[in-house]
Amino acid sequence: MRRLLLLLPLLFSPTATAQLPQITLTGIYPAGGQRGTSLDVTVTSGTDLDEATELLFSHPGLTATAKLDGNGNPISNRFLVSVDPGIEPGLYDVRLRGLFGISNPRLFVVDTIPEVVETELNNTSGQSQKITLNTTVNGRSDAAADVDTFQFSVESKQTIVIRSTAASLDSLMQPVLELYDGDGRRVAHSRRRQQQDAVIVYTSDDAQTLELKVHDTVYAGGNTYPYRISVDTRPQVDFVQPAIMQAGLQTDVRIFGRNIPGGQPTGLTIDHSPLLSKSVPVILPASDLQSIGTNSAASALDTCIYSGIDGNLVRFAIGPQAAHQPEKSPEEKRSPAQTVTLPASVSGSFAHELDEDVYRFSAKKGEVWLIDVLADRLGSTADPLLLVEQVTKDGEGNESFKRLAREESNRQNPGGNSLPTLTKDPSFQLTVPADGDYQVKLKDRYSVSRGAADMTYSITITKPKRDFRIVLFDSLPSADGKAPPATGAISLRKGGTYQIPVYAYRSGGHNDDIQISSANLPAGIQLSNATIPAGKSSTTVVLTASADAKELASFVQLTASSGAGDQKQDRPVTVATLVHAGANGLPRTGRVSGSLMVGVMKDEQPIHVLPGLQSAEVSQDQQLLVPIKLTRRTGFDDKVDIVFSGQPKNVDVPKVSIAKGQDSVVARFYFKDNVATGPSTLLMYATAQVPYKRNPWQVDRANQVAAQAEEGLKASAQSVVAARAAAESNAAKVVELANMLKTLEQQLVTQQASELATQAELKKAIAGQADANKQLVALQVKLSAAVSEKTPKNVNVDNAIKNLREATLAVNEAARPIADLSAKLKTLTKKIAANKKAVADRTLDITQAKSAVAKQQIRVETAKKAMAAAEAKVKLAEAAKKAAADSVKKAEAAAKPQNKNVRTIAVPIRVVVHLTPGKITVAVPGGGAIKKGASAEVKVTLARKNKFAGAVKLKLQLPNGESRVTSSEAEIAADGTEATLKLTAKADTAAGDIVNAVIRATGDFNGRKASFDAPITLKVTD
């Protein structure tokens, strides 16, 4: 698979551009998963996928949640799917819900073995993706000429089964499988045959690595070409006998296939592999879900796709089971016919070329037997030809054969060109002409060139039962009503309608009305025209959503009923969907869906028309006036055309338009005297070219995002201003702190110098004090000497006294600087201590200042970063603002009004036409002109019809609201043919033409009041 490309939300097909958008789903990937696991699933293709954020499954065991982006918003078209471990393997419906409603269903497969997703590049042998046995690969043919290759290992004598799944995925892929051995030789090959996908069963002689190549049959590819390949050792069931069973009742079923554990040889082969058989007990569940995926040609057949044999989906028909018997063995077929006892059920196959099977039975004159062959409807490739013959014998016992029917007889195709409901399977209701023997011959249409064991069929011969089946075609109406319905689902706009085709299969002589009802329609939704008239095989059901209906997606169950009392029959309504309109060599294809959903979208229906009546009973030769009311929305005010369909032949149908600015009109129908009697459904469509705005809410949301972006930009700009101011403030603070630090450092230098000077001065003072102390000591010595001289030994007393006095003075003088120095020393010591403290304080201040500068520098850097971040945020906000502005422009461009051809259906009118009692002719004088205040006598002549012999009353019938002319009443007696009416124009009325005037005759006929008309021309003149 090459790189996966997600689709843009808006995808349009050529037919869709002319109509209002409605979601359709054409591809999901992968289209299946293993139970008990979760997997990523992507919507790969579809139309009108806007805001698609819901996947809806037909079983509660399958759930999905939208993948989210980084902002927590759902990612369109991407989901996480969880598969409950208790869910049964098989096929399930999945739908997508978005802005434009709910989509058609696509198939999702649940299996039991591990799964992987194909990885590219794997187009050549050297690029083969390696897988293990018992694995399912989800792959896709991505483009033209895409070939996917896979490698896996097998053991000696091991048998493997390679199953492709594409038809069961609603895929356009038609897989071709090619298996190569370890030497590069192709050892097996298979391709899709009709409804059967390719299968390879291979037994390896040696342990080796095998290579599988997968491609489309015409090498096509794209998002609508998914496939699944299972490479495993599980059994391969090719067919079963019987293929018709009763639900809920255990039955021994003989399975035929390959790689069947415990299987017995049959002597036959399929694709060169031995065909084995084995008896197993089977109980078919009664759940409607089990019929999902059945071809629409079998939609009237009760079927079940059984998943009780791992790896296989086996299709059964459900019904009362007649005594079953297999066809004769090849040895037994040497006798001319196989005798069966009625009622009978026989399973057989066209095992070889020119294989013809003959079944003979005895019957009584007047008996009625339904001969029904099942092959195509159960997925077989056989195309049976049916021949019913009466067997007679002459007197000598020689047999002769009279043909009573051939294969084309009794085929029903109510879906016509819309839903493929025509089957190849023949059916014939035999009314036995005489007592005796009869025989049925069966052979394949192409028996001269083909035959195979799996070209199987089942034939039943049973008493016909008066019954019916209803199939609803869940689809999208065409834009113009001319093309057949397209793939779609019931998605209503508020105040709008939706039409759905419904088909009836009748059997056993059933010919009554069939009513369709629902017990669980959501609030605001109404179902109209829910009756298929007696003898009809189809109708159009109309659903209406009220203007105030809520947006929703709801599962709805419909029931069909017919008859009354003990004869009442209730049947579930089968839902069918269109898979392909015809592509890649595949025809227009439909299948059975397991559920019906009704959705109401956010959009409004621009126009809606409503007839003034929903039913009417008329006679041949009668006028019917239908008032029509128009509701305009979304500002639309131009002309609306009204067209009709469904009416029987020989009815004058009006061409009606509702003019600009008007909201009503009256439509005139005239049922001619040769119109067919019986019920019919009158469908009314309003068409107009409407200027349509696609998703205007997207503009509102875009504007809201733009406003938020603008506010975000303002906030970001303010953040920049604040961040810049903070950065500047912090930078200034750094300068201030740096200057302060410089001052502190200068002060520290000064204080340190002062401290040094003081210390030097102190040192000098200390030295001076020491000198003074020495001098004082010397003087004190001298004084002591002088004192000694004062002793008696000293004769020179006066001289001694003098010396003493001088020494004392010297000591005193010497002591004085010592005291001064001591005081100074104390002062210097204090000064030094103060200087040390100042130095320590400045040092601390400097340390703190440096720390403050560092911290402030960090603040500066932080502020710079904040400013840079704010500036970056501004740039992001500017980009967001620009992106939001661009989104607004894109949203406005997308929502710009574009002219769309809107076609909407009204609530249908059920009309019953009865035989007319007669025909009247009217002679109006003056061409119908009557002057104001004057009168005119009108002669009325009656011609009786259909054995009518009663009296009739006559009157002038005017449209509602018209009263300018009045009339007398008259009566034509039972034995009469003429009467006269007097018409009078009011004197004070307006002049002008009177349209849709008739003379109406009314009488009792066939148990009802029957009216019939004669149109007249009337004009009031001055």
Show the residue positions of the predicted features.
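Extended amphipathic alpha-helical heptad-repeat regions
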Residues: 695-901
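Bacterial N-terminal signal peptides
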Residues: 5-14
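Short beta-strand segments of immunoglobulin-like
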Residues: 28-34, 240-246, 476, 487-492, ...
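Extracellular/luminal low-complexity segments enriched in Ser/Thr/Pro
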Residues: 79-87, 284-297, 502-505, 528-532, ...
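Acidic, Ser/Thr/Pro-rich low-complexity intrinsically disordered segments
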Residues: 19-66, 72-76, 85, 89, ...
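Predominantly extracellular/luminal regions of secreted and cell-surface proteins
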Residues: 106-133, 308-343, 465-470
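Short glycine/proline/serine/threonine-rich loop/turn segments at secondary-structure transition edges
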Residues: 86-93, 221-224, 289-302, 449-453, ...
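Short proline/glycine- and polar residue-rich coil/turn motifs
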Residues: 69-75, 86, 192-196, 204, ...
